[in-house]
Amino acid sequence: MYYTSGNYEAFATPRKPEGVDQKSAYIVGTGLAGLAAAVFLIRDGHMAGERIHLFEELPLAGGSLDGIEKPHLGFVTRGGREMENHFECMWDMYRSIPSLEIPGASYLDEFYWLDKDDPNSSNCRLIHKRGNRVDDDGQYTLGKQSKELIHLIMKTEESLGDQTIEEFFSEDFFKSNFWVYWATMFAFEKWHSAVEMRRYAMRFIHHIDGLPDFTSLKFNKYNQYDSMVKPIIAYLESHDVDIQFDTKVTDIQVEQTAGKKVAKTIHMTVSGEAKAIELTPDDLVFVTNGSITESSTYGSHHEVAKPTKALGGSWNLWENLAAQSDDFGHPKVFYQDLPAESWFVSATATIKHPAIEPYIERLTHRDLHDGKVNTGGIITITDSNWMMSFAIHRQPHFKEQKENETTVWIYGLYSNSEGNYVHKKIEECTGQEITEEWLYHLGVPVDKIKDLASQEYINTVPVYMPYITSYFMPRVKGDRPKVIPDGSVNLAFIGNFAESPSRDTVFTTEYSIRTAMEAVYSFLNGERGIPQGFNSAYDIRELLKAFYYLNDKKAIKDMDLPIPALIEKIGHKKIKDTFIEELLKDANLM
């Protein structure tokens, strides 16, 4: 397995690997990583579909990529997915997945054309004081603190270790709009990993100019399940892949001799009945270890989503594997000590009455029902005790929605603070109470909130997710298992709790697909290179552009930097009529 850039290998078709007809694949989990592994086995590994088996404990595929109308509850999406043009492995896969919407097109074509016709942007990112846009929304307001971000990027991961974001940055950094944008967009909290924040800063530095208004982002036409999962399922079914639901893998016995690790037996329950599959070294096993949406509980408009700390299948499986080898990671690092303040609850509100719409449209300046971009991403309420954010994507978000309905995704970044209006913690609230808090912050008159939050006007389903921010917990090398653990012959880890050699960023669709691609190509010795992530952090043009936008579009001479006038004058003379001057001018720094 190796990496490549450019389009020479991107458009090449790898030849059939030697011995692939004697191999079989067993994939644990039908989240995006598991589905992608099956796609790459077929497309690039030339493995017959009937030799590929996927095991899913739930009755539905997709993992965290959800979107469903739950009987007796209503429409539910537990989270959203933000994409960008440099998700190299993701677009590499979806170019081969036929669109279910446009005959003869790929899903990449469908997505690309949608974004061309209706590019994403936000007209309002931050509000406060009951529905009023923050005056300096659109500015990072970092000032001198921009140098702290540069300092983070200059550090090595080894030197940061398990340091938290709060331990690295000053208090003034957290007062900036940059931190509000960053924390609420990516779900970072102060006690999360400084290493992961550094990875994010380096990975997405080319989008610094487009984060405040979300022009850097791209979204699906519908919810994640309909748009992203269904086309892959259709592709796999067309290749006769075996997908088994209500099947929970509980353990995998691994034989370790002479420095080699060979998966020998898969233990599982199928519809509650214990079964086992004996394996040979030619049987390839791909494990999705851990899950941010494992053990989710659902409330209703009148019921709370009950808090839980149940580990569930994916975490228990990882624990059983980790007990066999230190090379299989340390799951407790991620799930055991999540602070009470962490994000745990999201909610999906379905607006059924036009009385609420004006309070939204005065922020977006867009028609909710024209089928185009609405909020363009989340709108964050900066004076919300919950640090509440909400998003309204293109409507309908579900094909089953009625013509006048609008679905809204809501979440609170802080779970142990009382609301400004409801005076309860978000995890103690019913769907109606979460709606009341949201309407209060939108500026709905207090005497109308109770009525407009009633089920006659809106239906809101809260979800409690005990491990939703576990990706970002402080960690050190070895806490996440390598995609191919040292000495492994036939066992791979895939998904966002596996350690990709690429140092890409977790909590992204790209990372799920990348780890799957790395695992398949490693086992089958694929002769085609895996696309590198866009290394914008090593492009001086992108760095200069980011420096300009982090300082709110100021030229160097106007920045609050400790540069004496004499040195500045000498510096200008030295670079005059040089390539450096050209670069600085292109970045608007001179």
UniProtKB/Swiss-Prot annotation:
Any one of the GO BP annotations: response to toxic substance
Keywords for the protein's UniProt record, in alphabetical order: Detoxification, FAD, Fatty acid metabolism, Flavoprotein, Lipid metabolism, Lyase
Enzyme Commission numbers on file: 4.2.1.53
Domain of life according to the entry: Bacteria
Broad enzyme group: lyase
Binding annotation for FAD: 33, 56, 64, 82, 249, 291, 508, 512
Inactivation phenotype: In strain lacking this gene, consumption of the free fatty acids from the medium is reduced to about 50% of that of the wild-type. The mutant strain also appears to be 2-fold more sensitive to oleic acid than wild-type, whereas no changes in sensitivity to linoleic acid is observed. The mutant shows increased survival in blood with reduced adherence and internalization to human keratinocytes.
Pathway: Lipid metabolism; fatty acid metabolism
Catalytic site positions: 82, 200
GO function term, MF aspect, one: oleate hydratase activity
Cofactor note: Binds 1 FAD per subunit. FAD does not seem to be involved in catalysis but rather in the structural stabilization of the enzyme.
InterPro entries: FAD/NAD-bd_sf, Oleate_hydratase
Record field: catalytic activity: (R)-10-hydroxyoctadecanoate = (9Z)-octadecenoate + H2O; (9Z)-octadecenoate + H2O = 10-hydroxyoctadecanoate; (9Z)-hexadecenoate + H2O = 10-hydroxyhexadecanoate; (9Z,12Z)-octadecadienoate + H2O = (12Z)-10-hydroxyoctadecenoate
Cofactor(s), by name: FAD
SUPFAM superfamilies reported for this sequence: FAD/NAD(P)-binding domain
Protein family per UniProt: Belongs to the oleate hydratase family.
Subunit-structure text: Monomer and homodimer. Both forms seem to be active.
Note: Unsaturated fatty acids are toxic for many bacteria due to deteriorating effect on bacterial cellular membrane and disruption of bacterial fatty acid synthesis. The hydration of unsaturated fatty acids is suggested to be a detoxification mechanism and a survival strategy for living in fatty acid-rich environments.
Role: Catalyzes the hydration of oleate at its cis-9-double bond to yield 10-hydroxyoctadecanoate, probably in the (R) configuration, and of linoleate at its cis-9- and cis-12-double bond to yield 10-hydroxy-12-octadecenoate and 10,13-dihydroxyoctadecanoate. Is not active on trans-double bonds and esterified fatty acids as substrate; is only active on cis-9- and/or cis-12-double bond of C16 and C18 fatty acids without any trans-configurations, producing 10-hydroxy and 10,13-dihydroxy derivatives. Appears to play a role in oleic acid detoxification and bacterial virulence.
NCBIfam families per the UniProt record, alphabetical: PRK13977.1 (NF010584)
Protein name from the UniProt record: Oleate hydratase
Taxonomic classification: Bacteria, Bacillati, Bacillota, Bacilli, Lactobacillales
